[in-house]
Amino acid sequence: MRAALAAALLLAAPLAIAQDRAARLSERARQDREIVYFLQPPETHAFDLYHNLTESREGVDKYLNVVRAGSTVTNPKAVVLDTGEALPVETLRGEAIRAAGIDIGEPVRPESEVVVIRFPKLAAGQTLRLRISETYKDPGRYRLEGDELVFDRSFGRPRNAVVLPPGYYLTNSSIPTTLSETEDGRIRLDFVNPRPDEIAVLITARKRRARTAP
C-alpha cells in the first residue's frame, strides 16, 4: 500500500511542476497590459481608468475584472480597439456570480463584485485587442488627509500610470516614477513593474497655491 502511494506521488510530482510552470509562463510572460488612472478631486474618493489588453487564448469568450474589496465600480465600458465595436458588459454581485457559473479565483461573498465583458470565442491563432474603461470609488485607498492627497494602491500590471487631479503637484512617491505633464497641464506619473508580483505604490500630492496678482 505504501509502495503504491509513493509511486503515485512520484508520478504526480512532475505533472504538478509542469502545471505550475505553465501557469507562471502562460499569462505574465506575454502580458502587455497597461492601465492609466485619472484621479478626480480626492474628496470624492473617485478615479477614472482605462486599461488595454490583448487576449489570444484559444476558446476564451470573456474577460473578468474582479473589483477589489472596499471599491465600487460604475460605468464600465469595453471596445475592440481594431474596430471600435462596443462589447456587452455587465456587473455581477454576490449570488449572481455563483448563478452565472463564473469563477473569480476566490471565494464568492455577498459583497463580491465582478465586471464581465463578453466577446465571441477566440479561435486558434486569433487575438482580440480591448480597451476597458471604468470609474471607481475607493475611500480606503484614495482620500484627502488634511491638505494632502493620498493614493495608496498596489499595481500588478507591467505598465501603470497615474494622472493627478488638475492643479495638484507631486510631493512623494514610494516607487520610482517618470514624471511628465499632460497637454491640459496635469501631472502624470508612469511606473514600470518588471516583477511577477505587485508593487505597492503610495503617492502624496498637494494643490498648487493660486498665484496672487502683483
Regions found by a protein language model. Give the residues of each.
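Positively charged n-region of N-terminal signal peptides that target proteins for export
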Residues: 1-4
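Early extracytoplasmic/domain-onset interaction patches
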Residues: 19-67, 114
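Intrinsic-disorder/low-complexity, polar/charged segments enriched in Ser/Thr/Lys/Arg/Asp/Glu/Gln
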Residues: 34, 46-50, 59-63, 114, ...
